[in-house]
């Protein structure tokens, strides 16, 4: 397996774990919509995304957004926005 395949394989493992967390959390929220803030906070998925020399004001949820989009592209999660808040839930067959 080359480096690209290994990295993409690991991203798929991360996406699966994120999906499982969303599924486990759904019962605690109305209509199963899990707030993205809950997901990012519980899994500590906010990171600083710029080099140390650059300036950024705090951690951002870019990594979570990428992985959540991977799940959305595979039709494994649904996304909903209410006001400024984002929510996710698993797609049920």
Where are each of the predicted segments found?
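Short, Lys/Arg-enriched N-terminal segment that forms or immediately precedes the first helix
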Residues: 1-8, 51
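Positively charged, polyanion-binding regions of nucleic-acid-associated proteins
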Residues: 5-33
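Short, positively charged loop/turn segments that connect secondary-structure elements
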Residues: 28-33, 44-64
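A short acidic, leucine-rich amphipathic alpha-helix
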Residues: 38-40
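Short, hydrophobic-biased segments on the C-terminal half of alpha helices
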Residues: 65-69
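A short, conserved structural fragment
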Residues: 72-81
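Short, cationic-aromatic polyanion-contact patches
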Residues: 81-93
